[in-house]
Amino acid sequence: MPTNIYVTEEELKKQEKIMKEIAEENKGKNLYYHIETYGCQMNVHDSEKLAGMLEKMGYKYTENLEQADVLLFNTCAVREHAEIRVLGRVSQMKELKARNPNLIIGVSGCMMQEKNVVEAIKEKYSYIDIVFGTHNIYKFPQLLWEALNSQDIVIDIIEDTKNVIEELPVKRDSNLKAWVNIIYGCNNFCTYCIVPYTRGREKSRKPEDIIAEVKELAQKGYKEITLLGQNVNSYGKDLDEDITFAKLLYKLNDIEGIERIRFMTSHPKDISDELIYAMRDLDKVCEHLHLPVQAGSNKILKKMNRKYTKEHYLEIIDKVRSNIPDIAITTDIIVGFPGETEEDFLETLDLVERVRFDAAYTFIYSKRAGTVAANMPDQVDDAVKHERLERLIELQNKISLEKSAELRGKIVEVLIEGISKRDSNKLTSRTRTNKVVHFVGDESLIGKLANVKITETKAWTMQGELVEVIR
């Protein structure tokens, strides 16, 4: 596997040329693609880039796998369960390939950065045509061209790139809300996490490139952006200029047309007063902070290499809430980390009780090959993990329900996102605190900001009545 490479302008022009050649070859043909995405929002945005390139090469999107001429699986390696799901899904494609030998099947993403997975693909999935990772999406046109002109599997994996690749075509899933990468990779090396190995070291985009992208989105009518990074708080540390994440937020807040700014994910050790004050003072930055705590025991946090304590985390929460009283705070929590005792788990429950998160994404610890935690002693029994997860979910569901109930009877600002999937007579909208509200309204309101009165509440979704359209 090649190490870090610098992607030149000439290389990107080569890919552009190949895209044009494939598009010319595909003229007049009804060719289709389908992409299945697993994992985080970074993967979702990567899939949008792959879709953008495929559309530029003359392919149209289809939900029907039988109709597809190119089928891509963009994979996630964070948890073993996700890998099992992906490989199970890929194995189902053998019959489809037998019925349609000209179908190009590609597997990409974080799983492909693992050598053992690539070897398994070569040995057990001979009908796969293309294998590539997270760092060379820009090279997809060439890989597709090679697969179209060869009977051999095309494998292209690199460890990392030294530079950020800009200006790839993007086909976004929404014409209202957009993902915007600001930093790639991670330098934190939490002992349970494979991301630094699959996504590489931190690389920040230049602020002028981010600003240009957001201005273009505003001109196209996008109302909300979500800034993405494994740790957005690290933004700018690797750049030779005076820029921080908070300073970037100030620049983006000034862009006309954008109504809302969100971001994820933040690392507690890097939350600064500057960022808290920016969230408080900037009118477009939404009152929602996703701040993964992972555990409530200092012993476990140290074993995880999280670089903060329970007490430090609680201090951050107090400071955030004292400056932004109505903020919604969500988190990630892992149960069953190696060495976690009942006492350690009770510390986590205590933290959940004290913080009262609006929601928590809860996970059972999953051993990932190549991480420090995979070789730790005192692995927790599966039955104990599941029992602890159930207790944690029960507590958090109760808190989420109580937090949502606090909004009953109140009027809140929402961005109207579309028609409800469950009731075509209703619209789906989202509060600044990232809670979903359904209410009766005309589809002409989609894309508007409105005030809605909350009438019914569940843990994370609500019913409301339209009060007024803001703009």
Swiss-Prot record:
Give me the comment on cofactor binding: Binds 2 [4Fe-4S] clusters. One cluster is coordinated with 3 cysteines and an exchangeable S-adenosyl-L-methionine.
Which leading EC class covers this enzyme? transferase
Q: Which cofactor does it need?
A: [4Fe-4S] cluster
What's a single GO CC term here?
Answer: cytosol
- Please report the stretch or stretches of sequence annotated as the Radical SAM core domain: 172-402
The TRAM domain, residue ranges: 405-468
**PROSITE patterns named in the record:** MTTASE_N, MTTASE_RADICAL, RADICAL_SAM, TRAM
Q: Where does [4Fe-4S] cluster 1 bind?
A: 40, 76, 110
Q: Example GO molecular function term?
A: 4 iron, 4 sulfur cluster binding
Provide the MTTase N-terminal domain boundaries. Answer: 31-149
Q: What is its EC number?
A: 2.8.4.3
Query: Transmembrane stretches, by residue range?
Result: none
Note the subunit structure: Monomer.
Task: Report the family membership.
Answer: Belongs to the methylthiotransferase family. MiaB subfamily.
Which protein, by its recorded name, is this? tRNA-2-methylthio-N(6)-dimethylallyladenosine synthase
